[in-house]
Amino acid sequence: MSDYKNTLNLPETGFPMRGDLAKREPGMLQHWYEQDLYGIIRNAKQGKKSFILHDGPPYANGSIHIGHSVNKILKDIIIKSKGLSGYDSPYIPGWDCHGLPIELKVEQLIGKPGEKYSAAEFREQCRAYAAEQVAGQKADFIRLGVLGDWEHPYLTMDYGTEANIIRALARIVDNGHLMKGAKPVHWCPDCGSSLAEAEVEYYDKVSPSIDVRFAAVDKAQVLAKFGVSEAKGDVNVVIWTTTPWTLPANRAVALHPELEYQLVQVEGECLILAADLVESVMKRAGIDYWQVLGSCKGEALELLHFCHPFMNFDVPIIMGDHVTLDAGTGAVHTAPGHGPDDYVVGQKYGLEIANPVGSNGCYLPGTHPVLDGLFVFKANDIVIDLLKDSGALLHVEKLTHSYPCCWRHKSPIIFRATPQWFISMDRQGLRSQSLAEIDRIERQGLDEQNLSGWIPAWGKARIESMVANRPDWCISRQRTWGVPMAMLVHKETQELHPRTTELMEMVAKRVEQAGIQAWWDLDIRDLLGDEADQYEKVPDTLDVWFDSGSTSYSVVDARPEFNGHSPDMYLEGSDQHRGWFMSSLMISVAMKGKAPYRQVLTHGFTVDGQGRKMSKSVGNVVSPQQVMNKLGGDILRLWVASTDYTSEMAVSDEILKRSADAYRRIRNTARFLLANLNGFDPCKDMVKPEDMVVLDRWAVGCAKQAQDEIIAAYENYDFHEVVQRLMQFCSVEMGSFYLDIIKDRQYTAKADSVARRSCQTALYHIAEALVRWMAPILSFTADEVWGYLPGDRAQFVFTEEWYQGLFGLDAAEQMNDAFWAELLKVRGEVNRVIEQARNDKKVGGSLEAAITLYADEALATQLDSLQDELRFVLITSAARVQPLVQATADAVASELAGLKVGLGKADGSKCPRCWHYSTAIGQDAAHPQLCPRCVTNVAGQGEERKFA
């Protein structure tokens, strides 16, 4: 017999070498859908301890972008890893469906409500548009490999959810947190509505920067406060502002009570300025000569009166801690209707909350003859002319500064006092309770798993400062497409009906049946009878942040699959500290006195490879749809997992290419395992641990160590650590050591020998573990691998838990982990010498080499213990150990202390079956071409292996 190929155990598997993910994944998704994979998982996990990750609803408008993909993939990785850790972790995806962006889209399509279509018809169109957007986004999320109840997502426009949002507000009313007031709120003239904090973005804007004189009503009284009896000209307190248009609403000038102010004589007048800012004011006003006449603390000037620069009234000096020396003059123009700080200090002094600006951003009639009807930003120059005419303008220049803008229109917004409904931060202690909950979440996390409840830990300080400093929450909106506030107020007093919470429940029951339109269709006589004549509906809708912020109640508490469990985790982008995390915290504490979550995980924004924000104009946008169509969902998932999400997440074609390279290494490892498990039946062929070759037990132990570290990384949400450990296992421990060494034994040993079955047993255990490590991240590939693994098993890897069949070497054994770690280093040194010899054309491959290891006594003892099997570890045809002192001159010194490596050509000729060189080829007449080892493997009992 001259062709021995048929006697080899060559690797064989149907598992393809190429992932071809973009083509293969859609078919897998179809299979998952047809089999009801999500339902199978839920049944398998029934009765397990629960872990609830509550989905923050994306807005139902437009296609998903790379940031959406990051968010959904991170959630999916956590849900799947929790399943492997023995949790029942249902995932109900959701969408935010009401609000202005959808209104604006529908307006573009059919016009404003009340024009061609009634408000009721307009709402129906909004509902239909939102449903269409949900369908498009849902298809993309499913394509990412995200498992969830996609057949039954939650939508904030579901009738039941709309009703529960009203019930949430009723509970907050009942708990005494709601109040009405004319407070200044962010107002977008383009939207014609107030905006939430989270709907405000900041962009650079050029504004006029002006210093304005307010002249003292009683000059002598003011001079006396500075200890001055006389001075030349008027006495003027100087304010600085970048919003001249707000001056018609000025009702005071604020000073800091503790700051020192100076009375400064300049040509023809005296100016009152903060002492530390005198020089900077003089410099910008171009005043070269001045004299300080006197000084006093701000508090000395309290309630002195000064003339408004162009309106026919005077205003008081008031004290405010918000006054700083960061810029300006130390005196702050105060318009309580146009600024939160101004409003707060104005309340203290009982100032009028003047709001001369309409909802369209134009001055109301009766403001001022030259200003009435003008758009405020166009009025700045006219106000400056008024100041010039009255002699009140000290200085004007242009200033580029960061200015609040509407997130939708990107246009500058204003603060505008309008009658609105607010959740009070302090009336019932909501602020202090919320801050206490923020603390508790951190402590509870540290107590339970030594991991802060705020992940990363800096998230705590961020939300803490936001809650500590935030104003009362304006929850009312003047929109058409939104959940109604569903309250009734007395026509004369504007007080809420005394049975408000009871009436809101009656409305909620109607909304549950017919949606929010039921409120607008409702005749309040049906609720109040004869009393109806005294009451009217509150026409406002709720801020959409109230919709999404109340979902722990309106969705999680309501859905049966959550079994009454409250959410364990909220996970969103870092912008949500002031968005969903905050609104959810406020509502839950206002309703129940506790936070809605136990952990809050935040991820960074996506940027391009150079760290730049993605923008269509720059042309650096990475589309998740294109990535999936070109590379596949698993590559996108691997990029997400391998990137540290705690800061900005860089993505580009080059970065994704690196992810594809890493994917190939993992896939190749999985394929090698499957190909070499060909013909292995775990029921019949498994070798007991005590009978296995030592190296095989070491490999299983490596997998056990890797698994412990991988599970810990999953539990700490360190997914990039999972990927790094997975890569180290596949590339280093397996790829460049174990899998390399076992090829000879796996291919050439007798098919059913212990030597080969021991190796296959190790590969089987490793494959069972590896497929589970992969599953949360490389979900498509793990499912594919699962289908090729030998033995009876559940239909899907996603119903399983971490593999429990791993074991390792005993530390007391001679050939323990430390022994093999040392051998890894020795092999590395030998490989270096062989590589050099190949470059020098001394040998063609490692099997042409005979290696002599010159070792010190301790190392020699270790190496000798492998006996003749040392050569299999080194993958050479011969290997011997000699004392270090006998090292020849050509032996290569190594980086290992006590080792030199000698290399020569292997004696004998090459065996055509195993490719090892042997001097004993031809000793068996029946197989004259084979070495003795191959003869016993082909025709005898098969070789024995103990160590390698």
Swiss-Prot record:
One of its GO terms (molecular function) is tRNA binding. It is an enzyme of class 6 (ligase). Its main location: cytoplasm. Zn(2+) binds at residues 911, 914, 931, 934. It is found in: Cytoplasm. The keyword ATP-binding applies. A motif ('KMSKS' region) lies at residues 613-617. L-isoleucyl-5'-AMP binds at residue 572. Binds 1 zinc ion per subunit. Its cofactor is Zn(2+). It comes from the Bacteria. It catalyses: tRNA(Ile) + L-isoleucine + ATP = L-isoleucyl-tRNA(Ile) + AMP + diphosphate. Its EC number is 6.1.1.5. Monomer. IleRS has two distinct active sites: one for aminoacylation and one for editing. The misactivated valine is translocated from the active site to the editing site, which sterically excludes the correctly activated isoleucine. The single editing site contains two valyl binding pockets, one specific for each substrate (Val-AMP or Val-tRNA(Ile)). Belongs to the class-I aminoacyl-tRNA synthetase family. IleS type 1 subfamily. HAMAP family: Ile_tRNA_synth_type1. This is Isoleucine--tRNA ligase. It comes from Edwardsiella ictaluri (strain 93-146).
